[in-house]
Design a protein with these regions (language model features):
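Conserved HGGG/HGGXW glycine-rich cap/lid loop of the alpha/beta-hydrolase fold
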Residues: 59-108
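Flexible "cap/lid" loop of the alpha/beta hydrolase fold
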Residues: 147-155, 160-190
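Short beta-strand/loop motif that positions the catalytic acidic residue
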Residues: 243, 249-251
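Acidic catalytic loop of the alpha/beta-hydrolase fold
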Residues: 254-258
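Catalytic histidine-centered segment of alpha/beta-hydrolase-like enzymes
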Residues: 281-293
Length: 305
């Protein structure tokens, strides 16, 4: 069981005190996975984010956006949605405009028959940027989102202004060989309950993870199964040395999922990459949201200099 917890949890999303190493600067069968959300026709330039739908290549994606300025696109992990980024979208306006996307099958985005893979998610993100007339955004990815963005940066290097990789992995680890054989979508949800708890440091107040546990039963197991299986086979280790975009890596010192050792390994492979380490576990943005907001803001402002 410990092996299963370690492996599937590496596939889960990081939800930021910290040591800086860079210069101061739905139910089963439904169409979504994650939080219940309400669509809105337009985005506010500042303040509370607004939601709207964007049609791309046969699938409709739901996005949250707020603020003005240069675009920053946020990508969530395997068991969350765009809502985890809502407090950050207008935080850096008027210099940066925040856009958070529900990946296909998640949140308010449509769920096609297939395509819930790292590769397809990255293609969808480029199609979304095209539809929004965004050439080179800053990309921020958490856990699975960070895996997607490493693939995106390799496949579309000219579409990346900068990367922020949060609590993620390059796939350089031993994966549970039994993971692809877990066939029942409900099994993924049951395993995920344990993983969520195990991903927080001992002594974490249950209030931080209880909302996630309560939403497990609404997650679409089919989407979760395909995404987790894709994550179990994804591996860009040794190839990300080709990434030339400015990169910030963020990791929790107590993260047993995407460990500090993995983060340091990614830093060594990407020339000039900067690293920030927080005193948190895997769900960093739940444990220290204000710390994460500050670090991301410092990095974004540094890009503008």
């Amino acid at each position: 069981m410990a092996s299963t917890l370690l492996i599937v949890s590496v596939l889960l999303m990081n939800l930021a005190g910290c040591t800086s190493q860079f210069p101061a600067p739905h139910q089963e069968g439904s169409s979504s996975l994650g939080y219940a959300q309400t669509s809105a026709p337009s985005a506010r330039s500042n303040g509370e984010p607004r939601r709207r739908s964007v049609a791309i290549d046969g699938v409709t994606l739901s996005i949250l956006e707020a603020g003005t300025g240069d675009p920053v696109i946020f990508v969530h992990g395997v068991v969350t949605t765009s809502n985890i980024f809502s407090k950050y979208l207008s935080a850096y306006s008027p210099d940066f405009r925040g856009i958070a996307v529900d990946l296909r099958g998640y949140g308010d985005s449509k769920k096609p028959a297939t395509g819930f893979t790292i590769k397809q998610f990255s293609k969808d993100l480029i199609a979304l940027a095209d539809k929004l007339s965004i050439e080179k955004p800053v990309w921020v990815g958490v856990s699975m989102g960070g895996m997607i963005l490493q693939q995106l940066a390799l496949d579309y290097p000219d579409r990346v202004r900068a990367l922020v990789l949060v609590s993620t992995t390059d796939g350089a680890m031993v994966l549970d060989k039994d993971l692809p054989t877990i066939g029942n979508p409900r099994d993924f949800r049951e395993v995920s309950k344990n993983i969520i708890v195990e991903s927080f440091p001992l002594g974490t107040p249950p209030a931080l993870y209880q909302p996630l546990l309560e939403r497990i039963l609404t997650w679409n197991g089919t989407v979760l199964r395909e995404a987790l299986t894709s994550m179990a086979t994804a591996n860009v280790h040794g190839r990300i040395s080709k990434i030339t975009a400015p990169t910030l890596i963020v990791v929790g010192a107590k993260d047993d999922v995407a460990t500090p050792a993995i983060a340091h390994g990614i830093q060594l492979q990407i020339a000039g990459a900067q690293l920030v380490e927080f005193n948190t576990g895997h769900f960093m943005m739940a444990e220290d949201p204000e710390g994460f907001r500050t670090v991301l803001g410092n990095y974004l402002r540094g890009l503008s200099r």
